[in-house]
Amino acid sequence: MDLWFSEVHTPDVKLSLRTAKQLYAGKSEWQDIDVLDTPAFGKILVLNGHVLFSDADDFVYNEMTVHVPMAVHPNPKKVLVLGGGDGGVAQVLTLYPELEQIDIVEPDEMLVEVCRKYFPDFATGLDDPRVNIYYQDGLRFLRNCEDDYDIIINDATDPFGHTEGLFTKEFYGNSYRALKEDGIMIYQHGSPFFDEDESACRSMH
């Protein structure tokens, strides 16, 4: 049987990948989670029908997300990652011995367990002794932070559903308060290449 997975971008555009088999399918309190094995990219993680990353290309996102703020900040010691349950960002952060504390705030515990099982090379970062995982909402977590972090990385998915709160005025205000005076915040931003994505990108600002 010829199996294909398709991620629909617009009524006229979709990304399709030949799929060898489905390794996992589940539904957490927050989202649908699928792991597929593909000949071209290896295993891919799919959340709510959208590809999050693959074995072949995770470094593109994770390394750019981490290395830029780490190169710019003069003396980073404490980092907060909002989202990041797959462990990819944490894995790159743990390459820096100068970091003393890495806090991961991820509401979806099922996502973390799935990634530990199917993407162990990425999830190894979650086992570093400097890493603390908090299973809670990122916006609520930030409300109790003040002058705590050198770097905040918003590694949440696009601003829909349970992540909407991480792209609001309250979130940015709380992030500013949680950062130290020379702190840096970085967050992922989808591409508005298609007209259908424009409203989502605008909502992040």
Where are these regions (language model features)?
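N-terminal auxiliary segments of SAM/dcSAM-dependent transferases
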Residues: 1-44
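The AdoMet/dcAdoMet-binding core of the Class I SAM-like
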Residues: 2, 53-187, 194-201, 205
